[in-house]
Amino acid sequence: MNPNFLEFEQPIADLEAKIEELRLVGSGSDINISEEVAKLQEKSITLTESIFRGLSSWQISQLSRHPKRPYMLDYIKRIFTDFDELHGDRAFSDDPAIIGGMTRLNGQPVMVIGHQKGREVKEKVRRNFGMPKPEGYRKALRLMEMAERFKLPVLTFIDTPGAFPGIDAEERGQSEAIARNLRVMSQLKTPILATVIGEGGSGGALAIGVCDHLQMLEFSTYSVISPEGCASILWRSADKAPEAAQAMGLTAGRLHELGIVDQVIKEPLGGAHRDYDQAADAIRKALAAQLESLCSMETDALINRRYERLMSYGNVVSDPADE
């Protein structure tokens, strides 16, 4: 099976293999097979549309972790210009799992901050598989406070399985670093836009996710724990991950229904990894539209709106018939 395809995409993989086989046959002979290839390509598109219309929460969770899915640096190259990366938390060290710096969106200066996973083995290890340590969150906080001083909007990109749970991270104050970010971001005197581009795992995601506008890519996820972790706690078996994913409501569509997410950004057919440029263009347009609206607001009104937005989470409306 082609490694670019997940298990539930096997019928698509088989069809794409046939198309590739026909192309190889046609390239080595005088037989015109363009019409047959076109028919199979059309069939592949129809099949992909059919499969992706009915994805389960677990299948979407798998897509959010796809090894070929674009990461933050892939989007920075396609969405922004003049990116100048800034390093270090000015207290301990620099954490490569968090990337941040000043850049421009359609010519407007902004501060961009986000998680970065690794693509190859060495890079995965260097970036700790996208799991930040306290110094990563303190670096993010330093850049946010810098953005506030220079009146730059803050754009965050969320893609992490969670904050690093190692002993060294706990010794250096992992929970304190996350909590401080939550507090400061809730009162930051500049617009904050957050985009979930892959996994949004627990406090590790939330530490750069307090915002005025939260948007998610169509096949990204946002949850308090991974489906496997939830299944291990509730059922004592990670095999129950599909059931856990369904119960958790971690998909962009479900979170939008619940009012947690403000906007769902449509991905290219088959997922963002099928077309980096198209996915980046969709994010760029969404960011530009929201940025114009938020930057026009008075600072006090912006912070009050953000506070009310946060306080609206978790409200329970009881049915009078049940009382």
Curated annotation (Swiss-Prot):
SUPFAM superfamilies: ClpP/crotonase. The keyword Ion transport does not apply. Its main location: cytoplasm. Residues 32-293 form the CoA carboxyltransferase C-terminal domain. The keyword Cell inner membrane does not apply. It is found in: Cytoplasm. It catalyses: N(6)-carboxybiotinyl-L-lysyl-[protein] + acetyl-CoA = N(6)-biotinyl-L-lysyl-[protein] + malonyl-CoA. Disulfide bonds: none annotated. Its EC number is 2.1.3.15. One of its GO terms (cellular component) is acetyl-CoA carboxylase complex. Pathway: Lipid metabolism; malonyl-CoA biosynthesis; malonyl-CoA from acetyl-CoA: step 1/1. Keywords: ATP-binding, Cytoplasm, Fatty acid biosynthesis, Fatty acid metabolism, Lipid biosynthesis, Lipid metabolism, Nucleotide-binding, Transferase. It comes from the Bacteria. GO terms for biological process: fatty acid biosynthetic process; malonyl-CoA biosynthetic process. It is an enzyme of class 2 (transferase). GO terms for molecular function: acetyl-CoA carboxylase activity; ATP binding; carboxyl- or carbamoyltransferase activity. Component of the acetyl coenzyme A carboxylase (ACC) complex. First, biotin carboxylase catalyzes the carboxylation of biotin on its carrier protein (BCCP) and then the CO(2) group is transferred by the carboxyltransferase to acetyl-CoA to form malonyl-CoA. Belongs to the AccA family. Acetyl-CoA carboxylase is a heterohexamer composed of biotin carboxyl carrier protein (AccB), biotin carboxylase (AccC) and two subunits each of ACCase subunit alpha (AccA) and ACCase subunit beta (AccD). HAMAP family: AcetylCoA_CT_alpha. This is Acetyl-coenzyme A carboxylase carboxyl transferase subunit alpha. It comes from Alcanivorax borkumensis (strain ATCC 700651 / DSM 11573 / NCIMB 13689 / SK2). The gene is accA.
